């Protein structure tokens, strides 16, 4: 990406969020758009794939507090076509320390080229040159970090609670195997004469500064392939697919995003690999539910068990049943707790199993059961469970 594109691209607009959006709002917007335009959900749709890349790029900047700050400050300074010196500024003089802004000191070399180190340099790729220096100044193209990759995986309810190792197939740009990443079929590219191997050319912007863009002749690589590789068309990068075993930790929740450092696309020119982000989807369970670190289950009990009390066996997820004691007069909907039978927490301990009692009413009653219920009704004929209800209704 050119520095001009970086400054002029409105990442807030890409994600559809305001400039004062919170981290949570940015994350929510990104997840919604990423799911909508993910390549797996839009196979063969080139526009959706390009949109997904744009969304991921915006999230990479706005989702990182430091990068977002640098991006906002750079847009403020250069969003209107470049920095304009204040009254009294002459030539290449500059009375504002950009090094303070970008996390590195400004290097001055009498207008013969230079730059800013650290901080935003990783994002801008050497944004500034002093004094409008021409092509060939600066350092040779630096190693470039590989792209981040996002993938999705669907787990069963039990796998999400206990953790699982799953195969994950990913596609990304990697050094072309046919030409060993050189872009040249013979493996011997030559140094680009336009940028003298830097991969960048300078253009004036006024105020004694010049901005750098990727060299149009070598596409920012610093090298030109005399004999372009047929596989990568001289770019040195080709699409590569690989399958790796990914360990999903215990206790993950639905829609959780897991970051695996260094497992993304390989870097360029010896640069580090990007990161892999795995979005986890969890299937529903026919019996158990989940509330945070706790699991939930509804257990039916008879009228007699609820009224008289007793012991009830309760199933657990992947383990032996536990026995809970019902106190006499247990109402329908009461929730009890089986400690340590829930989901795994980050510290390795487990949450609880929340057991909700559901008093069942038989549809067909006959024989001794009917006689017993008739006797119970006669014995409690003087009791009115709705008396307090009507009393409260009158007093309201």
From Swiss-Prot:
Query: How cofactor binds (record note)?
Result: Binds 2 Zn(2+) ions per monomer.
Summarize where Zn(2+) 2 binds, as residue positions: 192, 195, 215, 218
Q: Where are the CXXCXGXG motif repeats?
A: 176-183, 192-199, 215-222, 229-236
From the Swiss-Prot or TrEMBL record, what is one GO molecular function term? zinc ion binding
- Zinc fingers typed CR-type, residue spans: 163-241
Show the segment(s) annotated as Disordered. Answer: 127-149
GO BP annotations, alphabetical order:
chaperone cofactor-dependent protein refolding; DNA replication; protein refolding; response to heat
One Pfam family in the UniProt entry: DnaJ_C
Q: Which residues bind Zn(2+) 1?
A: 176, 179, 229, 232
**What function does this protein fulfil?**
Participates actively in the response to hyperosmotic and heat shock by preventing the aggregation of stress-denatured proteins and by disaggregating proteins, also in an autonomous, DnaK-independent fashion. Unfolded proteins bind initially to DnaJ; upon interaction with the DnaJ-bound protein, DnaK hydrolyzes its bound ATP, resulting in the formation of a stable complex. GrpE releases ADP from DnaK; ATP binding to DnaK triggers the release of the substrate protein, thus completing the reaction cycle.
Q: Which family does it belong to?
A: Belongs to the DnaJ family.
Name it. Answer: Chaperone protein DnaJ 1
In which organism is this protein found? Streptomyces avermitilis (strain ATCC 31267 / DSM 46492 / JCM 5070 / NBRC 14893 / NCIMB 12804 / NRRL 8165 / MA-4680)
Organism lineage: Bacteria, Bacillati, Actinomycetota, Actinomycetes, Kitasatosporales
Gene name linked to the record: dnaJ1
């Amino acid at each position: 990406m050119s520095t001009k594109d970086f400054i002029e691209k409105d990442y807030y607009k890409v994600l559809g969020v305001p400039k004062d959006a919170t981290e949570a709002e940015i994350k929510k917007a990104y997840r919604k758009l990423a799911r909508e335009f993910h390549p797996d959900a839009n196979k063969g749709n080139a526009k959706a794939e390009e949109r997904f890349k744009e969304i991921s790029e915006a999230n990479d900047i706005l989702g990182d507090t430091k990068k977002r700050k640098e991006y906002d400050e750079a847009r403020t300074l250069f969003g209107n076509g470049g920095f304009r010196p204040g009254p009294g500024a002459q030539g290449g003089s500059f009375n504002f320390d950009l090094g303070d802004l970008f996390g590195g000191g400004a290097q001055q070399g009498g207008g013969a080229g230079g730059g800013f180190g650290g901080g935003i340099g990783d994002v801008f790729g050497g944004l500034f040159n002093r004094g409008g220096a021409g092509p060939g100044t600066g350092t040779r193209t630096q190693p470039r970090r590989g792209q981040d990759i996002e993938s999705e995986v669907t787990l069963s309810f039990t796998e999400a609670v206990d953790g699982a190792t799953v195969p994950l197939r990913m596609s990304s740009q990697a050094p072309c195997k046919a030409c060993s990443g050189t872009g040249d079929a013979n493996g011997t590219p030559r140094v680009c004469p336009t940028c003298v191997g830097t991969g960048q050319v300078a253009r004036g912007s006024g105020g004694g500064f010049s901005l750098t863009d990727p060299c149009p002749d070598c596409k920012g690589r610093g090298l030109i392939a005399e004999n372009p590789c047929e596989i990568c068309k001289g770019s040195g990068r080709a699409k590569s697919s690989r399958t790796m075993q990914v360990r999903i930790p215990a206790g993950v929740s639905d829609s959780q995003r897991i970051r695996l450092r260094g497992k993304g696309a390989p870097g360029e020119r010896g640069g580090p690999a990007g990161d892999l982000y795995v979005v986890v989807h969890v299937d529903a369970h026919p019996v158990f539910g989940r509330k945070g670190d706790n699991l939930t289950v509804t257990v039916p009990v008879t009228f007699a068990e609820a009224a008289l009390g007793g012991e009830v066996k309760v199933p657990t997820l992947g383990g032996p049943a536990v026995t809970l004691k019902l106190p006499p007069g247990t109402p329908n909907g009461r929730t009890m707790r089986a400690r340590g039978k829930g989901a795994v927490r980050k510290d390795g301990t487990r949450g609880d199993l929340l057991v909700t009692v559901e008093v069942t009413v038989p549809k067909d009653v006959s024989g001794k059961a009917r006689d017993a219920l008739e006797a119970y009704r006669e014995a409690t004929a003087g009791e009115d469970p709705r008396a307090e209800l009507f009393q409260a209704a009158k007093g309201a």
